[in-house]
Curated annotation (Swiss-Prot):
Pathway(s): Porphyrin-containing compound metabolism; heme O biosynthesis; heme O from protoheme: step 1/1
Top EC category: transferase
Keywords in alphabetical order: Cell inner membrane, Cell membrane, Heme biosynthesis, Membrane, Transferase, Transmembrane, Transmembrane helix
Database matches in PANTHER family: 4-HYDROXYBENZOATE SOLANESYLTRANSFERASE, PROTOHEME IX FARNESYLTRANSFERASE, MITOCHONDRIAL
Something else known: Carbon 2 of the heme B porphyrin ring is defined according to the Fischer nomenclature.
Primary location: membrane
Organism in which the protein naturally occurs: Burkholderia pseudomallei (strain K96243)
Similarity-based family: Belongs to the UbiA prenyltransferase family. Protoheme IX farnesyltransferase subfamily.
The protein's name in its UniProt record: Protoheme IX farnesyltransferase
GO function terms (MF aspect): protoheme IX farnesyltransferase activity
Function of the protein: Converts heme B (protoheme IX) to heme O by substitution of the vinyl group on carbon 2 of heme B porphyrin ring with a hydroxyethyl farnesyl side group.
């Protein structure tokens, strides 16, 4: 999420909480919880729901803390992230590492105890994908960092599904694919209006390496692909008319933003598109949940 220097140092607890990127963690956990409910025609057992939610949230927070640790010098050079306690030097490297280790350990134990080993190992693999492969290797090396690294960020629905069933079937991977394709246009609109930040930090984001026009075109192309991919839950029979209607309406507005960015770009427009992309994903997954339980009632 976009955050500016209006943040001020707070209590020690709030500083540690900031390391977990709470709003990003909340979205990831939300998608995981939707995956849990879609995995069963009835209700999710409360122990699995509670344990899966807490465990996935803890490991996500642990991964984000490692990200803050690795990127503290980069964050200090960027207006969007300079407020973070790691960038300000308010928390030491050892403290961040210890905090991340505790969160990760508790998260893994919670998942193993209240869900199943598959969920634990998949979530640990997601942690490695984000904290190590994306943060350490992909992000500083290639403008395709978001495309390739998006795989780890797309996993929450599969983690939730696995928590309930102990398996990851095709329908779960459709949900993963939706987030995977959503990730590039979501981050590229941010990179467009924060281009100077990334350029100053030496990060090879697409607008920095290939220019604004190239990035605008790829935002449009990926949004078109995203619109098509979001039809898959209906085509596969996983979802019905409630979801389809929502996906078409939400996707049409996302496409409108992408088209406007391509044809008549402004930083203000990119900011609105970035914020909408978060609302879009949240409402899309909410529509999946509503459809899942409404479909047997309305028969559509």
């Amino acid at each position: 999420m976009d955050t500016t220097l209006s943040h001020t140092p707070g209590s020690r607890l709030s500083q540690y909480l900031a390391l977990t990127k709470p709003r990003v963690t909340q979205l990831a956990v939300f998608c995981a919880v939707i995956g849990m409910f879609l995995a069963t025609p009835g209700m999710v057992p409360w122990k699995v729901l509670l344990g899966g939610t807490i465990g996935i949230g803890l490991l996500a927070g642990s991964a984000f803390a490692i990200n803050c640790l690795v990127e503290q010098k980069i964050d200090a050079m960027m207006r969007r992230t300079a407020w973070r306690p790691s960038a300000r030097g308010e928390i030491t490297t050892l403290q961040i590492l210890a905090f991340s280790t505790v969160l990760g350990g508790l998260g893994a134990w919670t998942l193993y105890t209240f869900t199943n080993p598959l969920t634990m190992w998949l979530t640990i693999a997601t942690f490695v994908g984000y904290a190590v492969i994306y943060t350490l290797l992909l992000k500083p090396m290639t403008p395709q960092n978001i495309v390739i690294g998006g795989a780890s960020g797309a996993m929450p629905p599969a983690l939730g599904w696995a928590a309930v069933t102990g398996a990851v079937p095709g329908d779960a991977w459709i949900l993963v694919l939706i987030i995977f394709v959503w990730t590039p246009p979501h981050f590229w609109v941010l990179a467009l209006y924060r281009r100077k930040d990334y350029e100053n930090a030496g990060l090879p984001m697409l607008p920095v390496t290939h220019g604004e026009q190239f990035t605008r075109l790829h935002i449009l192309l990926y949004t078109v692909i995203l619109f098509a991919v979001t039809m898959m839950p209906f085509i596969s029979g996983m979802s019905g008319a409630v979801y389809l209607t929502s996906a078409v309406l939400l996707g049409a507005l996302f496409l409108a933003y992408a088209w406007k960015i391509y044809r008549d770009y402004s930083d203000a427009l990119a900011r609105r598109a970035f914020r909408y992309s978060i609302v879009y994903l949240s409402l899309l997954f909410a529509a999946l949940l509503v459809d899942h339980y409404a479909r047997p009632v309305i028969g559509m």
